[in-house]
């Protein structure tokens, strides 16, 4: 049976209203929480475009930090979260996980999980670390005669007295400083009485919530816990600084991925998570931020040996912490920090 002209035009119009598979994919949007500043720009320039090529989906960035993302999730509730995936420090992830926001990872949808180091999987199957920013000891080479070799030197080298910088307790690094001191001078990381006493024994310190670089550059401090990548950047700017990888192990900022149990784009979230764990994305992150990749297939090349000292077999030097313990005692520990450390 032949179509008349009106029927043919009607059929064409109806077909035009039906989205193609490619168009449908383009209509899907994944909201990705990310840090601001250089992280946001890197995500816009590198990560988001690469994921769009892979998935055909759009990416909308929601800029903030772990505290902001947690507040947004709690305001919406576990049943209607604004995100499908969250990447943040485990200290924030642990509390949200306990409140029922995240699901146990479906590893069938996350094949690159099997290529990660064991140190990246310490969340009981609920999350996975994409990368670490290891923290050792940074110092001024022109103001220190005896460079540190280990964390204990912060207490034992008289040159450092009243010239030490610390992150404050609001920062996850401040919490790690307490647990580290507890481990160094007490029975274990839970021996916070010993930890607080040790921190008090440091004497007067300069504390910051985020940036120790300004104080180090100005000579207000001569030594502090420092992200290796930050020391590498300061050194390239001509500042007389260096770092050491402490003998007792390193602290580290983690970027832990979590899938929302009731997220609006959960399948897309798994694609995105698997992409971030891929060798290609891990290479981008390592070269962009000097982070330690968690995919075992990606190791720091010789030209990045200084910028990324913790890689390959050295990933085992990253110290692990009980964030459930920290979160359970958050208020008490914060008050003790304020009265003991300042």
Task: Show where each model-derived region lies.
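N-terminal secretory signal peptides and thylakoid transit peptides that target proteins
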Residues: 1-16
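Early extracytoplasmic/lumenal segment of secretory-pathway proteins
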Residues: 26-94
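Extracytoplasmic ligand-binding site segments that recognize negatively charged/polar headgroups
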Residues: 37-44, 82-220
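Short amphipathic alpha-helical coupling segments at ligand-binding clamshell hinges
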Residues: 43, 47, 150, 191-198, ...
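A ligand-binding cleft/hinge motif common to bilobed small-molecule-binding domains
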Residues: 93-95, 217, 222-240
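Periplasmic-binding protein-like
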Residues: 133, 196-200, 237-263
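Mature extracytoplasmic/periplasmic domains
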Residues: 260-318
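Extracellular/periplasmic bilobal clamshell ligand-binding domains
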Residues: 302-342
